Structures are given as C-alpha cells and as structure tokens.
C-alpha cells in the first residue's frame, strides 16, 4: 500500500493479514515470478525494485532503477523484468538471475528531450520480442524490440488518444486505455513532426 509504505501478505484461507513488510518508500505495484518463489515490488517513492522471497517471507534484494518506477512486466521465462520510470522517460531492463539493471531504454520522442513523457504502462507481445510502452504525456506508445535483452532497439511510436494509461496485448491486437479521451490533446505547442531532433520547450507559471 502507498498509505503506509508497506507490503501486506494475506492468508486467503483465514482471510487475515499474515505479515506486514516495510518498503522504505511508496509502493506502486507488484508481480510474481512465473518460475521462482519471488515477488517484485516497484517502489514508487524510492527509485528501486524490491525482491521479496515468498518462501522465506523477507526481502532479499534491492535493485536501483529510475525515478518514480511504476508498472512492471516480466518475461514468460522469468529471466527478465521491465519497469517503467515515469519521471525520467526510461524503462529499466533487469536481469532477474543477476539481480541488476542491464539496459536502460529511452522512450522520449527525441533523444535529448526533457523529462515529461510520463511512462505508466508496459505490455509484451505474445512472442515476447516487442515491448509496448504507454507514454501518457506524449499521447503515444513507444515500441522496442527486446528480443535480446541488453541489445534492444527502438521501433518507433504509435499515436494514441489523450493520455494513454494502460496498454495490453490480446492476440495480434494492441488495446490502449486513454485516460482523458480520444483526441490527442492538450499540448498547445505540439506534438510537431517538423520540430528538430532534440529541440525542447517549457512553459513558466506563477503559483503565488
């Protein structure tokens, strides 16, 4: 839970809490390994991924990732994990056998873009070779060939509706939930296909 920065373990037979484990920061989501007795927890407020051994009932590893990690996607063989880092336009690729980041994917529209893509959802293709990344504030999906983790390559972008918040793969179809509607709004300055690579803009405001 985010409210008290803890992982709760619930006994489904007795419908009671069997353990509470501090995360050291706000948790976002968790996912079970398909092959190991491990649970992976993205620590939203800590810039880290925690590894919880479900047999030993304790955290066994902490893996440093990017800023504001949220959604998690694990390969079917349980060897690799992808975590979306909302605050710095990146996805951390983690080798779950070595428990370390082996690659960082940049999902911004331009190589030198300022932070602000706001990644918030991941989905792997059925063949496990393509990763789809929801860039909420870019109104797009970023696509990466991840067939060989550690040597991934960008495949480009797919335009979406306004503020994509979730992406899922069903067969050969990509389903995207648009949090604010169907039109790609509300950036008055773009996206602009003619903008030069690396050109960025910002707006000032007065909060007083």
Language model: regions and residue ranges:
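Predominantly soluble domains enriched in secretory-pathway, periplasmic, or organellar proteins
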Residues: 1-208
């Amino acid at each position: 839970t985010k409210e008290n920065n803890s992982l709760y373990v619930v006994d489904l037979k007795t419908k009671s809490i069997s353990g509470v484990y501090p995360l050291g920061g706000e948790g976002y989501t968790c996912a079970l390994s398909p092959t190991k007795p491990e649970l992976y927890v993205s620590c939203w407020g800590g810039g880290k991924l925690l590894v919880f051994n479900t047999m030993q009932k304790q955290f066994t590893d902490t893996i440093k990732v990017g800023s504001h990690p949220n959604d998690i996607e694990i390969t079917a063989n349980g060897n690799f994990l992808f975590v979306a880092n909302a605050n710095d336009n990146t996805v951390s690729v983690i080798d779950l056998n070595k428990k370390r980041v082996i690659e960082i994917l940049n999902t911004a529209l331009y190589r030198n873009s300022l932070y602000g893509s706001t990644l918030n959802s991941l989905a792997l293709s059925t063949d496990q070779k393509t990763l789809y990344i929801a860039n909420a504030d870019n109104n797009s999906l970023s696509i990466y060939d991840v067939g060989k983790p550690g040597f991934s390559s960008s495949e480009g972008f797919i335009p979406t509706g306004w503020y994509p918040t979730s992406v899922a793969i069903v067969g050969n179809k990509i389903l995207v939930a648009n949090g604010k509607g169907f039109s790609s709004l509300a950036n008055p300055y773009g996206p602009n296909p003619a903008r030069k690579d690396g050109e960025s803009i910002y707006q000032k405001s007065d909060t007083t």
